Amino acid sequence: MENLIIYAFIYLLSSIPFGLILAKFFAKTDIKKEGSKSIGATNVLRVVKEKNPKLAKKLAIATIILDFAKAAIPLLTLKFLHYDQALLWSVAVLAILGHCFSIYLLFEGGKGIATGAGAMIVLLPLEVLTAFIVWVVIGKIFKISSLASLAALLAFVVSSFIFNYDLEIHTHAPVFIIAFIIVYKHLPNIKRLIFKEECKVI
């Protein structure tokens, strides 16, 4: 019963669309109706930037921090309380599911990068650092958020086998589930990348 309460809490918490809330409250803009219609930091930056560039950067950074924290803080708390690895990985997957398929948005949502990073920084920090370096490098070179994110995801999955070939839960299934969710949410971006139609962020 305790585990079910934890799972429900994590899903409801991670479902909170911080990017949407921040853009509506501070910029009076509905990002679900503009840009890529995603609730993530990239769309916050892209949409709000048209009206207020300085505010756009602040809101995008705040969105990243909050989306990251809504997974990282609960997982850090549970880890501190010595909950087992199986529960921690279940919580990580649910956090990403909640963000990507928010109950408050009729199961629509973001693309899972910041929330995924927040979850994985607790469980696989070295892999997240590797992914972050790849994200920065690809982002600097191509200035395409989705390409940088997908490259970082690939780096994360590959490095998870290099640095943690035998996870404590004895399976990489949660890593693949998380990767699948994120790739699924990026399918429109992948299509635009193939046809060279994806927009640059900067």
Curated annotation (Swiss-Prot):
Source organism (scientific name): Campylobacter jejuni (strain RM1221)
Record's subcellular location: Cell inner membrane
Family affiliation: Belongs to the PlsY family.
Molecular functions (GO terms): acyl-phosphate glycerol-3-phosphate acyltransferase activity
Coiled coil: none
Protein's job: Catalyzes the transfer of an acyl group from acyl-phosphate (acyl-PO(4)) to glycerol-3-phosphate (G3P) to form lysophosphatidic acid (LPA). This enzyme utilizes acyl-phosphate as fatty acyl donor, but not acyl-CoA or acyl-ACP.
Bilayer-spanning residue ranges: 3-23, 87-107, 118-138, 144-164, 167-187
GO CC, any one term: plasma membrane
Protein name: Glycerol-3-phosphate acyltransferase
Enzyme class: transferase
